[in-house]
UniProtKB/Swiss-Prot annotation:
GO molecular function, one term: DNA ligase (NAD+) activity
Keywords from the UniProt entry: DNA damage, DNA repair, DNA replication, Ligase, NAD
Active-site feature positions: K129
Keyword NAD applies: yes
InterPro entries (alphabetical): DNA_ligase, DNA_ligase_AS, DNA_ligase_B, DNAligase_adenylation, DNAligase_N, NA-bd_OB-fold, NAD_dep_DNA_ligaseB, NAD_DNA_ligase_OB
Chemical reaction(s) catalysed: NAD(+) + (deoxyribonucleotide)n-3'-hydroxyl + 5'-phospho-(deoxyribonucleotide)m = (deoxyribonucleotide)n+m + AMP + beta-nicotinamide D-nucleotide
EC numbers: 6.5.1.2
GO biological process: DNA repair; DNA replication
Function: Catalyzes the formation of phosphodiester linkages between 5'-phosphoryl and 3'-hydroxyl groups in double-stranded DNA using NAD as a coenzyme and as the energy source for the reaction.
Protein name stated in the entry: DNA ligase B
Protein family (similarity comment): Belongs to the NAD-dependent DNA ligase family. LigB subfamily.
Species name: Pectobacterium atrosepticum (strain SCRI 1043 / ATCC BAA-672) (Erwinia carotovora subsp. atroseptica)
Length: 563
């Protein structure tokens, strides 16, 4: 029920419902010059997308992302330029007048506001908010004589010829009034579409594109019609639905249900969100039967109907910061810290970018807007950078040349992250399995300058541990015993703890073999073990013959750890 020609007004809400909390709009901390630059730049970008949308009939970005950026622009304008209203630009060729104006829908998401709206009205009905493009159909003496796009609500494009090629739009009606007007949604017909899992799939843009093509395509046969308004139609909703069904508009009756409370609306909203449907939806519409006469309708929000939208599959968030971490093997990972948002039932404030090189390709910095969705197993995924701020802050990233498979076996300020990652791996279940030694404990020892390299802890005394702030006698004793238990571990456990790149399927290759024998193995001999190919064999041999690893093994040998 929405096309890119509506005027969006910012709605600031304070509550949330249905597991989808609303977030109050916060004005950016910008001076007027910066605000003007950002507002102008985003407005120009939206206008470029509008031009593509109207001239080529396709959307360069997802519909729900466009909607959110349009709302973002209006929010900024409310903050810094409240005297200006920034509507979406309309196509130049929308000159066909509507016999009855298309109204808009006020969108509510606050529980208190929704309940209040419902209790103040009677004879209410709920429908799915079908996501397509709005149209006016005019019938005279049972014959379709006009079809007009929504446009600005007062006039739009003449779609009559295209409408006559859509099988789902009846051309001739029997038993119809002599002259009447319908308003509805042209949608892309789907098979068992589940909104919660599949999202909008840009169905709206596909329909809009087809309706603006000069030459018809097979897509026309995939377009359906959902009638949601009959200006000056039967007064009672049951009579209105029966008459629509009799004339060939049965879908409206199938998906319009009486409600008496907010709980009823919530039930249908959840049902349609998860159930297979023949169309894409982006929420529900709650409407009262009583409406003013069509001649009084205006292209503003109606007061007899409201929308309660679903959370978008792709949510737009501001990038607050860029965080870098260096892992055990020296790989630099990048994570974006974003303004908190809700995806399904998950609160998300961080999203993984991947490698340093990928972050540079994304060119994403604080102040940018990114599109985020849920990937498999509910993991937040960065989909795209949908808007870049006009000012590009300088972010100093780690030099990836400083980190590799053999860096940071010794502590330094630069090495802190990789060094800690090595220790966490060493004490974990894949290594020595040392009780009580997790990242927090290793950090405490590092902060007390007790760890010069990855073996320094082996020589700590109980007294040194007891001197660590907040340790206590019993805790110090337990940690000391845990650390010393490593002396009883085999050489194979130690090699795995230090990071030898032997896959778990080939761990038997390390059992009951001394250091010299391991070093003397050839690449061909290593490849005899499960999961070890040519490249992995070379990595294992490089590990066994690296000077720092050889030094560490020599120290273990002095401690009686041979095989």
């Amino acid at each position: 029920m929405w096309l890119r020609n509506s005027v969006f007004l910012i709605i600031i809400v304070v509550g949330g419902i249905g597991g989808f909390p609303a977030v109050a709009a916060v004005c950016p901390d910008w001076d007027n010059t910066r605000a003007s630059k950002e507002i102008d730049a985003l407005r120009q970008q939206l206008e470029q997308w509008d031009d593509v949308y109207y001239t080529e009939g396709k959307s360069p970005i997802e519909d729900d992302v466009y909607d959110q950026l349009r709302e973002q622009l209006n929010q900024w304008s409310q903050c810094f330029q409240p005297q200006n209203v920034i509507p979406a630009r309309l196509p130049d060729n929308g000159k066909q007048p509507h016999p009855v104006a298309h109204t808009g829908l006020k969108k509510l998401s606050d529980r208190v506001q929704l309940v209040q709206w419902i209790v103040q009205r009677e004879d209410l009905w709920v429908q799915p908010k079908v996501d397509g493009v709005a149209v006016t159909l005019v019938y005279q003496h049972g014959k379709l004589v006009s079809a007009v796009s929504r446009g600005n609500g007062l006039q739009g494009e003449d779609w009559t010829e295209k409408a006559r090629l859509i099988p789902d739009i009846p051309h001739l009606l029997s038993g119809a009034p002599s002259s009447f007007v319908l308003q509805g949604e042209l949608f892309l017909k789907m098979t068992d579409h589940r909104q919660y899992a599949q999202g909008g799939v840009n169905a709206r843009s596909i329909v809009a594109g087809e309706m603006r093509r000069h030459q018809p395509s097979p897509v026309l046969s995939q377009i359906g019609l959902f009638v949601w308004e009959w200006p000056d139609g039967p007064k009672a909703m049951p009579e209105r639905l029966d008459k629509l069904k009799e004339m060939g508009f049965a879908m409206t009756a199938d998906y319009t249900h009486a409600i008496e409370s907010f709980a009823d609306v919530e039930k249908w909203r959840d049902h349609w969100y998860h159930s297979p449907l023949p169309f894409v939806t982006d929420g529900v519409v709650i409407r009262q039967t009583k409406e003013p006469q069509g001649r009084y309708w205006r292209n503003t929000s109606a007061d007899w109907a409201i929308a309660w939208k679903y959370p978008p599959v792709h949510q737009v968030a501001e990038v607050v910061d860029v965080a870098f971490s260096v892992g055990r093997t020296g790989k630099v990972a990048v994570v974006l810290k974003i303004s908190p948002l809700k995806l399904d039932d998950k609160s998300v404030s961080r999203v993984n970018v991947g490698s340093l090189s990928r972050w540079k390709q994304w060119d994403v910095l604080p102040g940018d807007r990114v599109s985020v969705s849920l990937a498999g197993q509910g993991i937040p995924r960065l989909d795209n950078v949908v808007w870049r701020g006009t000012e590009r802050p300088v972010i100093v990233s780690p030099d990836e040349h400083n980190f590799h498979a053999f860096s940071c076996f010794r502590y330094s300020v630069v090495c802190q992250q990789q060094f800690l990652a090595r220790l966490v791996w060493l004490s974990g279940e894949h290594g020595l399995n040392l009780a009580g030694m997790r990242d927090g404990m290793w950090l405490r020892l590092m902060q007390h300058d007790l760890l010069g390299d990855v073996l320094s802890w082996l020589y700590l005394t109980e007294a040194q541990l007891n001197a660590v702030n907040g340790m206590g006698d019993k805790r110090a004793r337990d940690i000391y015993m845990s650390l010393q238990s490593a002396r009883q571990k085999s050489l194979s456990h130690w090699l795995l703890a230090l990071g030898i790149p032997v896959p778990r399927s080939a761990i038997s290759a390390l059992n009951n073999v001394n250091w010299l024998a391991l070093q003397q193995r050839t690449a061909q001999q290593w490849r005899q073990f499960s999961g070890i190919g040519e490249r992995r064999a070379e990595e294992i041999m490089a590990f066994l013959n690296h000077p720092i690893v050889m030094e560490l093994i020599a120290r273990l040998d002095l401690e009686g750890i041979h095989r």
